[in-house]
């Protein structure tokens, strides 16, 4: 029994040492890639188009609301030949955000009652 326990401890120690070595090897390359991706994401996040503003220049540039990303919706105004595109939130997503907000608020009340 002591032999099995000693063998198990030795096996766990070797496994943790080998996994730490592999993480060190991959760590530097992954860290550099992660930093560049974060910088790109921050640069892209600054360029989002607010709700009800023109998004015809880039239809994927709409900002995010609390839970969902707004959608670039294009339409022709009455009596006009020009297409107008604006960032809008679809109604079903608007209702889902309201429901999530109410559920979050109700969860806070329950936590307050029983917490």
Curated annotation (Swiss-Prot):
Domain notes: The presence of a 'disulfide through disulfide knot' structurally defines this protein as a knottin.
Xref: InterPro entries: Spider_toxin_CSTX_knottin, Spider_toxin_CSTX_Knottin_CS
Protein's cellular compartments: Secreted
Originating species: Lycosa singoriensis
PROSITE patterns: SPIDER_CSTX (PS60029)
Tissue specificity field: Expressed by the venom gland.
Disulfides per UniProt: 48-63, 55-72, 62-87, 74-85
Keywords, in A-Z order: Disulfide bond, Knottin, Secreted, Signal, Toxin
Residue ranges of the propeptide: 21-44
Record GO cellular component, one term: extracellular region
The name this protein goes by in its record: U3-lycotoxin-Ls1k
